[in-house]
Amino acid sequence: MQKVTIQEAEHLLQEIMSEEDDRFQILMKDERKGVQKLISKWYKQKELAQKEKEKFLEMSKYENALREKGLTYIAGIDEVGRGPLAGPVVTAAVVLPKDFYIPGLNDSKKLSEAKRERFYDEIKAQAIAIGVGIVSPQVIDEINIYQATKQAMLDAVANLSCTPQYLLIDAMKLPTPIPQTSIIKGDAKSISISAASIIAKVTRDRMMKELGEKYPAYGFEQHMGYGTKQHLEAIEAHGILEEHRKSFAPIKDMIQK
């Protein structure tokens, strides 16, 4: 192999998958700083990819154990929006295929918005079935947030295009005859729950951005309905909306004044 330019070396390293590759051995002997920097970057990327693979395998253990028992339709369930002062609580139920693989999958709160959006599209493309449950602020006020979250989760399961044989749920138990396991911090421990958390988060964020367009003075597209200083000041200045949860403090206290 003739001596390559730094740019050519970069392209080569994108193709090279193993240190055993003859081209890699030649680049290793290239003493130019630019090439050595690229090799160092290649090693770091390989190390990150290996860590992501190990994390993904660790997060697949619940699903794999159930598949070994002959189950196919395993639904991961998670919610987003229990804490905000405005907007709905949104849940998702996701059934993934056996060969599903998205390295870097994690709890939606730990991912950047760009990564969440990309993973959302990939999950949509690969999933066997996805169901979403949405419960309005009015119903939250009527039955309380805990019951509303349960209801949204049951709705998400009902909206699946297949009947799940088992449920993996993030920190909740559901009144359903379908066998289930409740996993604390499940969105970081199960790929199905993690996928559900991403679907729920992106779905709710998009709804809140639409609310932001409808009520530009409130900044919903920034705080997603949570009780930030900006949001509380907007409520003081412009009033309480129908999208606000009247049973949540401090809105409840504002109404009683």
UniProtKB/Swiss-Prot annotation:
The record's keywords, sorted A to Z, are:
Cytoplasm, Endonuclease, Hydrolase, Manganese, Metal-binding, Nuclease
In terms of PANTHER family, this protein maps to: RIBONUCLEASE H2 SUBUNIT A, RIBONUCLEASE HII
Task: Report whether Metal-binding shows up as a keyword of the record.
Answer: yes
Domain called RNase H type-2: residue spans: 72-257
Cofactor(s) the record lists: Mn(2+); Mg(2+)
User: Pfam families recorded for this chain?
Assistant: RNase_HII
How are cofactors bound according to the entry's free-text note? Manganese or magnesium. Binds 1 divalent metal ion per monomer in the absence of substrate. May bind a second metal ion after substrate binding.
Q: A single GO molecular function, which one?
A: RNA binding
The EC designation for this entry is: 3.1.26.4
Q: What is its main location?
A: cytoplasm
**At the top level of its lineage, which domain of life is listed?**
Bacteria
- Supply the name of the protein: Ribonuclease HII
Question: Which reaction is the catalytic activity of this chain?
Answer: Endonucleolytic cleavage to 5'-phosphomonoester
Query: Which GO BP terms sit in this record?
Result: DNA replication, removal of RNA primer; mismatch repair
Q: Which family does it belong to?
A: Belongs to the RNase HII family.
Described purpose of this protein according to its UniProt entry: Endonuclease that specifically degrades the RNA of RNA-DNA hybrids.
As for subcellular location, the record says: Cytoplasm
According to its UniProt record, this protein's enzyme class is: hydrolase
Positions with a binding annotation for a divalent metal cation: 78-79, 170
A Gene Ontology cellular component where this protein is annotated is: cytoplasm
